[in-house]
């Protein structure tokens, strides 16, 4: 099903982006990975190329910058010969509750997580429309659906990604372009980073109890 498909994967230098890129290459797709972490990005792409059977390249991108997105996607489409799929995991997280989130962290997460989604989707849409259709897969988060007190700005940004995805899906469907979002939960690098800040079981349980807005969490 994926053999020969032409795919761009953002955030490909680690975590879900890396896993997504490798899975596509293993399925026989031709992939261009993109990230800001160039050393890791090149290394992962080279490793994926060796395992195959698909092919993989790497291009630097800053998803929050329109010129960077436009330039990198143009290069990728030339390499691939077109664009069938955009997988967009690229995101950033900074922990802070609603009372203490800084303007700087808020702006950073919305610039990368929300504006980055809008920019990459718009550019991908342009190329897909020209070739008759395609699929855009945004990466939302369970945090965008339920309260995440320790990640207030991140949760808000992912909620915005969900809303954008619904809007783009309803708008671009007429052009044979599907826009969907997947919502990862626990086993991600962001989760493990958060877990390192709370090593005791009691602290972990307290964290999840605090996710219940009126603090009525129960044990059974």
Q: How would you label these PLM feature ranges?
A:
Residues 97-98, 105-107, 208:
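Substrate-binding pocket helix/loop in short-chain dehydrogenase/reductase
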Residues 99, 146-152, 174-175:
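Active-site loop immediately N-terminal to the catalytic Tyr-X3-Lys motif
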Residues 121, 157, 165:
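Active-site helix of classical SDR
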Residues 126, 170-174:
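Alpha-helical segment proximal to the catalytic Tyr-Lys
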Residues 27-43:
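Conserved glycine-rich Rossmann-like NAD(P)H-binding loop of the short-chain dehydrogenase/reductase
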């Amino acid at each position: 099903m994926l053999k020969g498909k032409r795919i761009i994967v953002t955030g490909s230098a680690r975590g879900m982006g890396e896993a997504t890129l490798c899975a596509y290459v293993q399925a026989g797709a031709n992939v261009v990975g993109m990230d800001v972490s160039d050393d890791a990005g090149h290394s992962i792409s080279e490793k994926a190329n060796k395992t195959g059977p698909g092919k993989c390249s790497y291009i630097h991108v800053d998803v929050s910058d329109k010129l960077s997105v436009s330039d990198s996607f143009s290069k990728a489409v030339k390499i691939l010969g077109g664009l069938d799929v955009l997988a967009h995991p690229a995101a950033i997280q900074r922990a802070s509750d609603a009372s203490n989130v800084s303007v700087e962290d808020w702006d950073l997460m919305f610039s990368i997580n929300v504006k980055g989604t809008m920019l990459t989707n718009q550019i991908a849409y342009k190329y897909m429309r020209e070739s008759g259709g395609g699929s855009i897969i945004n990466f939302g988060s369970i945090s965008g659906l339920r309260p995440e007190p320790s990640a207030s700005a991140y949760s808000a940004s992912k909620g915005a990604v969900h809303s954008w995805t619904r809007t783009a899906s309803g708008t671009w469907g007429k052009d044979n372009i599907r826009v969907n979002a997947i919502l990862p939960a626990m086993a991600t690098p962001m989760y493990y980073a958060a877990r390192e800040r709370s090593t005791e079981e009691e602290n972990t349980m307290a964290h999840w109890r605090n996710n219940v807005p009126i603090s009525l969490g129960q044990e059974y």
